Amino acid sequence: MNQKLKVAIIGSGNIGTDLMIKVLRNAKYLEMGAMVGIDAASDGLARAQRMGVTTTYAGVEGLIKLPEFADIDFVFDATSASAHVQNEALLRQAKPGIRLIDLTPAAIGPYCVPVVNLEEHLGKLNVNMVTCGGQATIPMVAAVSRVAKVHYAEIVASISSKSAGPGTRANIDEFTETTSKAIEVIGGAAKGKAIIIMNPAEPPLIMRDTVYVLSAAADQAAVAASVAEMVQAVQAYVPGYRLKQQVQFDVIPESAPLNIPGLGRFSGLKTSVFLEVEGAAHYLPAYAGNLDIMTSAALATAERMAQSMLNA
């Protein structure tokens, strides 16, 4: 089947532009319909024009006025959390059945991490891609969660300062809140916590993620196997996703429990997972794995939805 569904991308910054290149190069069920920005001089809009994609710098209102809008089935929103709320309202009014893939921390729709819960949300009109830290770490929490009950999970996402554009910087509070919540909702942890670090080092460092999971006592080999299997599943759409070293385990005995603020005393198994995410360097440099994992997860989500719509 050669039929493809048309997509528009709102936001002509780092994420939007990388996503456009991924759609143009890699998509099987989607094709570019329009690229939407608010800065007429942005590199993303200029690049879209050079690649033959229809553009507008009049935001969502401009998109709705384009003749191409009639054929748009999917919209990727790569703006900011506050902008997404307005964009959703305008688009929904203009075309009630349009599908939105939200790459901001707005989270109007359910959280989606493709390897964990995409199949549950194929029919949803708005899904939220959590955050870059969430896409990288929630699969690891879920991997432990399918072996043992997870009481607490804490993630630290370290990204290069250079890869954080104005949208990322404006959304730091939303990043921590959305990621923490999604660790609980999708990862299966009773309590989640997220920390983001922007590293100003030059040359820029690759995205690194540390995941600490406190769970009920469990077979360490089973946890390690579950983590390895999940890493492989993520690599299907983010080839640069990998374990930095072997999974580390610490048994916390009942005689010397840990005190977790808000949860009380804990004994069981502490699992530490160390990840790095290298980008595919389609538009962004390879060190910007944090942005690449977002665009890759968003494309994987929309592709699976489009496939399901075309096969219906």
Swiss-Prot record:
GO terms for molecular function: acetaldehyde dehydrogenase (acetylating) activity; NAD binding; NADP binding. One of its GO terms (biological process) is phenol-containing compound catabolic process. The keyword Oxidoreductase applies. InterPro entries: Acetaldehyde_dehydrogenase, Acetylaldehyde_DH_C, NAD(P)-bd_dom_sf, Semialdehyde_DH_NAD-bd. NAD(+) binds at residues 12-15, 163-171, 290. The keyword Lipid biosynthesis does not apply. It catalyses: acetaldehyde + NAD(+) + CoA = acetyl-CoA + NADH + H(+). Is not activated by Mn(2+), Mg(2+), Ca(2+), Zn(2+) or Co(2+). It holds the Pfam family Semialdhyde_dh. Its EC number is 1.2.1.10. Activity increases gradually over the pH range 6.5-8.5. Belongs to the acetaldehyde dehydrogenase family. Heterotetramer composed of two DmpG (aldolase) and two DmpF (dehydrogenase) subunits, which allows a direct channeling of acetaldehyde between the two active sites. Catalyzes the conversion of acetaldehyde to acetyl-CoA, using NAD(+) and coenzyme A. Can also act on propanal and butanal to form propanoyl-CoA and butanoyl-CoA, respectively. Is the final enzyme in the meta-cleavage pathway for the degradation of aromatic compounds such as phenols, cresols and catechols. NADP(+) can replace NAD(+) but the rate of reaction is much slower. This is Acetaldehyde dehydrogenase. It comes from Pseudomonas sp. (strain CF600). The lineage of its organism: Bacteria, Pseudomonadati, Pseudomonadota.
